[in-house]
Amino acid sequence: MLIKVNFMEHYLLNKQFELASAIKSRNKILIHKLVSDVLVSYNSLCYAVYKTLKNSDDKSSSNIQKKKKKKKNFQNLVDSLKCFVLNYDFYKIRCLNLYYLRNFIDCKDQFLHFHFLDIALQNLYSFIFFPFLESNLDKFTYGPRVFRSSIDAVKVLFLLGKQKKYSNYNKYLFCFAFNYTIVKCFDAVFNSWVLSNVSFIDKSILSFWVKNGFDNFYSGDQFFFQKKNFEINRGTSLIFLVIFNFVFMGMQFFLESSILSKFGFFSKFVLITDLNSVVILSSDLKTAKIVKSSLLIFFHSRGICQNFRDNSIVDFFCKNCENKNFVFCGITFHYKLIHGEYKFVLSPILEKIKNVKKKVLNLCKKFSKPLVLFDNIKPLMKSWFNSYKIIKNNYSFLKLSYWIVGKITKSIYLLYVNSNFERGKFGIRKGRRSGRLYKNIAAQVVKRLYFLKDQQRFFINTIEGKIIFKGFSVGLSKKNSIELKNFFSNSLKGKKFFATFGKNFF
């Protein structure tokens, strides 16, 4: 069963229309009320930022006049924040004027555009709508951070304006900061929470992003990977889409417990979001409707989705459904008649992934010689590549390639170490195995993985010539390092690629 609930878009649009009509009628009371509804969190957050930036002045025990001046400067900041309107075309929020923050940063030439700060605060504040950290929230803390608040992130935005090397990026400062700085502000506490509470999204991919510092961009159903740099990148940051899905996992646990306590039964469901709407995946209609009503109550209690349109909630349960397919977050859901009932099923690509994984597992268990295993894996991978070219689902292929590289490499490595197949070649002597043996084994494993050559999903460091395995690293000789560099494409030079192997790798 599947339900789609549009919440954030309609709330912002309604606020925009109400504010526009109030401005036309010059109703100052209504304008002040509408603006204060959205800015209720901005005031305390800006005051916290102001106190943080002026912490050195606070320590000085002199001058009551300085304190009065600070309050006046803070009031100017609040007044300027009230001069914005919600705009759907510009990330749903835009300032009417620009405000020079020379009172808050010790710089005469540099300044920040206030629409950039508004967007940053709006995105950071949106995390308060989710329940998994409500017990840890206070008036100066917003977002999924336990021991640190989003004040740190906003403070970084202020400090960016005083650095001369970013002066050319004032026009695009929002894109730069959110693709590089804000993502970096999420600390290890939040990352550990995500990795321990996510069940349906690949943990290894997020762990890979966190450890290696990749920027990820989402465009339609295409996933792109690019090393972090100081260039302005176009597109919406995928990390926020992933984090929002993780946050909705926290909401899912919250709803599961509340449904169990209220209705006395437990039924599994999944919430997926694209930052603008929510999809509820459930096994039966009863659970889906209960989850939908619980979500509406949850959103209403936080002041969003107050006025739903007729088409803001879409139910996909009618037998005469015109939409045979439904695409959401790059995943295609097919509406089919199964055992007399119309149900949504996942796209065939996911079923094919399950079959490929089963075959790979069987092959890894069946064969005891590395070369025989490679010979049997090749035709399986060729068939998978052919189907991938037709379907063109990069996300599914990425997850499968991660899993295959980890599984096959680990299996082959253990075969090389534990079997008698390579004893004569590497000259294994009794007792402790030498480091030279591990180097040769690592080189042989990487050489034989040539069927994934063009995908660049490997775990090598071409600078230091190391291969990272489970629990330890293997250093390669100069000769083997040169062979590795020739083996991979030139675009891999100077970049680090690591992989870890665990029980929950995929």
From Swiss-Prot:
Key words of the record: Chloroplast, Plastid
A single GO cellular-component term on record: chloroplast
Subcellular location: Plastid, Chloroplast
Family the UniProt entry places it in: To group II intron maturases.
Protein name, UniProt field: Uncharacterized 59.8 kDa protein in psbD intron 8
Species name: Euglena gracilis
